[in-house]
């Protein structure tokens, strides 16, 4: 039977030492073309020719996380640019006197006029 110190030492070695080391050293993932490009884009390797046939799961997970963060940041920037463009175009339309309310009233007026003209035409026959 293990003593308390022996048991604690074994647990500490197991939780801190071996599992992380094994995850980093066991290279069991074969990256596809997209993953190879991601490994280059994130800076893990300088070119696709340097990438080995097998890499560790930990390296691929870190690479995917970096790409996910980059993509989210790009989408945030594009959303902000799109909002700025919409604000600018709305202000330009307001300067011209265009508004959604005016457009709605004009559409309803045209619709009602067309309905009245269609309604009166069959009655005249």
Curated annotation (Swiss-Prot):
Query: Which biological process, per GO, is one annotated for this protein?
Result: cellular response to hypoxia
Transmembrane segment boundaries: 69-88
Where does it reside?
Membrane
Q: Name one Pfam family in it.
A: DUF1075
- The glycosylation sites annotated in the UniProt record are 112
Domain of life, per lineage: Eukaryota
Sorted UniProt keywords = Glycoprotein, Membrane, Transmembrane, Transmembrane helix
Per the record, its GO cellular-component terms are:
cytosol; membrane; mitochondrion
What family classification does the UniProt entry report for this protein?
Belongs to the UPF0389 family.
Q: What's the protein called, per UniProt?
A: UPF0389 protein CG9231
- Gene source species: Drosophila melanogaster (Fruit fly)
């Amino acid at each position: 039977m293990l003593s308390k110190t022996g048991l604690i030492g074994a647990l500490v070695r197991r939780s801190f030492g071996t599992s992380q080391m094994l995850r980093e050293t066991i290279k069991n993932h074969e990256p596809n073309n997209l993953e190879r490009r991601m490994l280059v884009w994130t800076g893990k390797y300088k070119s696709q020719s340097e990438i080995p046939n097998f890499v560790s799961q930990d390296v691929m997970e870190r690479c995917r996380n970096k790409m996910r963060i980059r993509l989210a940041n790009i989408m945030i920037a594009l959303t902000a640019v799109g909002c700025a463009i919409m604000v600018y175009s709305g202000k330009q339309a307001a300067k011209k006197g265009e508004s959604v309310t005016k457009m709605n009233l004009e559409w309803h007026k045209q619709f009602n006029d067309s309905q009245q003209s269609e309604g009166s035409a069959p009655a005249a026959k």
